[in-house]
Amino acid sequence: MSLVHINIFLAFTVSLVGLLMYRSHLMSSLLCLEGMMLSLFVMATMMVLNTHFTLASMMPIILLVFAACERALGLSLLVMVSNTYGVDHVQNLNLLQC
């Protein structure tokens, strides 16, 4: 395993630990999710380029599409919660249940 792979895996792990530890604000959770998706994108791109597997060449693009959808839903939820309650605490999301 090269140093680049270790650094990308470490970035994913740090983002995951940040997501698990700092769950008080929605914005910090969204930033940690974004870091995870970025490291997954880089890992998928490197895998496709290193293995020359042409059938999987669309996988990084599909991952970016899902990341954009996740980003849009997360930001719309952030705007809705902060307009309704005035703060972006994750604990306010429990009040949105039907």
Curated annotation (Swiss-Prot):
Keyword hit for Transmembrane: yes
GO process terms (BP): ATP synthesis coupled electron transport
Signal peptide range: none
GO molecular function: NADH dehydrogenase (ubiquinone) activity
Subcellular location(s) of the protein: Mitochondrion inner membrane
A Pfam family hit: Oxidored_q2
Enzyme class: translocase
Organism superkingdom: Eukaryota
UniProt GO cellular component terms: mitochondrial inner membrane; respiratory chain complex I
Catalytic reactions of this protein: a ubiquinone + NADH + 5 H(+)(in) = a ubiquinol + NAD(+) + 4 H(+)(out)
InterPro entries: NADH_UbQ_OxRdtase_chain4L/K (IPR001133), NUOK/Mnh_C1-like (IPR039428)
Membrane-spanning segments: 1-21, 25-45, 59-81
Membrane topology of this protein: Multi-pass membrane protein
Keywords: Electron transport, Membrane, Mitochondrion, Mitochondrion inner membrane, NAD, Respiratory chain, Translocase, Transmembrane, Transmembrane helix, Transport, Ubiquinone
EC number: 7.1.1.2
Function description: Core subunit of the mitochondrial membrane respiratory chain NADH dehydrogenase (Complex I) which catalyzes electron transfer from NADH through the respiratory chain, using ubiquinone as an electron acceptor. Part of the enzyme membrane arm which is embedded in the lipid bilayer and involved in proton translocation.
Family listed: Belongs to the complex I subunit 4L family.
Assembly, per entry: Core subunit of respiratory chain NADH dehydrogenase (Complex I) which is composed of 45 different subunits.
PANTHER family in the record: NADH-UBIQUINONE OXIDOREDUCTASE CHAIN 4L, NADH-UBIQUINONE OXIDOREDUCTASE SUBUNIT ND4L
Protein name: NADH-ubiquinone oxidoreductase chain 4L
Organism: Equus caballus (Horse)
UniProt gene name: MT-ND4L
